[in-house]
């Protein structure tokens, strides 16, 4: 099965051999009077988790969908440009307004919300051990505690901004790409 997400807020499963549709799922229904109000979009790739996918949509919801049937396992109202991140038994989501929230993985109860990065156009959170890392439109990298969302550090990386989500390598390094073309491998170190 091939999973594809689209700008119309739909996720579609296709057979790998023939590309035939198997199922489709909508993260939200367009509502409102203007085109902007009716916009429902999936900006990130669905996150594949064993027999399910997790997907978030702009002006839609965060949902876990069975990969075989396309049936919704659970959903929660949300608005995000990116797919969620998973780590430490939790779900981390950057909301469309820049707030970052943590949900407990087993019951989706909200653990914390970090609103100090509101309206900074943050990237998808990258989970690196006990920390989350996001970039923003001004080119800063922000390091947050995965446990409580508190800001732990900040680094000016690229004056032209960061739009590509930070990637975590197998050895725990951070792969960061800025809008100005700067590509770096960084390591998180805790000050004593």
Where are these regions (language model features)?
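Structural signature of WD-repeat beta-propellers
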Residues: 6-7, 50, 57-58, 95-96, ...
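Hydrophilic extracytoplasmic domains
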Residues: 95, 136-139, 144-192
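WD40 beta-propeller blade core
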Residues: 12, 63, 101-102, 142, ...
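Hydrophobic beta-strand positions that form the internal "hydrophobic ladder"
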Residues: 2, 53, 91, 132, ...
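Extracytoplasmic beta-rich repeat domains
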Residues: 1, 24-48, 72-88, 110-128, ...
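Short loop/turn segments that connect beta-strands within beta-propeller blades
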Residues: 16-19, 66-69, 104-107, 145-149, ...
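Loop/turn-rich, solvent-exposed surfaces of beta-rich toroidal or solenoidal domains
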Residues: 90-102, 109-143
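Beta-propeller domains
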Residues: 7-8, 43, 48-50, 55-73, ...
């Amino acid at each position: 099965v091939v999973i594809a997400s689209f700008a119309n807020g739909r996720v579609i499963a296709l057979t790998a051999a023939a590309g035939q549709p198997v199922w489709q799922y909508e993260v939200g229904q367009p509502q409102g009077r203007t085109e902007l109000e009716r916009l429902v979009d999936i900006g990130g790739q669905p996150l594949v988790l064993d027999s399910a996918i997790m997907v978030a949509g702009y002006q839609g919801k965060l949902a876990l969908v069975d990969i075989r049937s396309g049936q919704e396992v659970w959903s929660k109202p949300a608005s995000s440009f990116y797919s969620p991140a998973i780590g430490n038994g939790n779900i981390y989501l950057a909301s469309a307004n820049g707030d970052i929230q943590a949900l407990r993985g087993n019951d989706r109860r909200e653990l914390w919300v970090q609103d100090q990065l509101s309206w900074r156009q943050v990237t998808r959170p990258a989970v690196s051990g006990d920390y989350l890392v996001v970039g923003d439109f001004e080119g800063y990298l922000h390091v947050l505690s995965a446990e409580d969302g508190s800001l732990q550090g900040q680094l000016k990386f690229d004056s032209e901004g960061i739009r590509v989500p930070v990637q975590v390598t197998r050895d725990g390094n951070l792969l960061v790409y800025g809008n100005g073309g700067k590509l770096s491998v960084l390591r998180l170190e805790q000050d004593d």
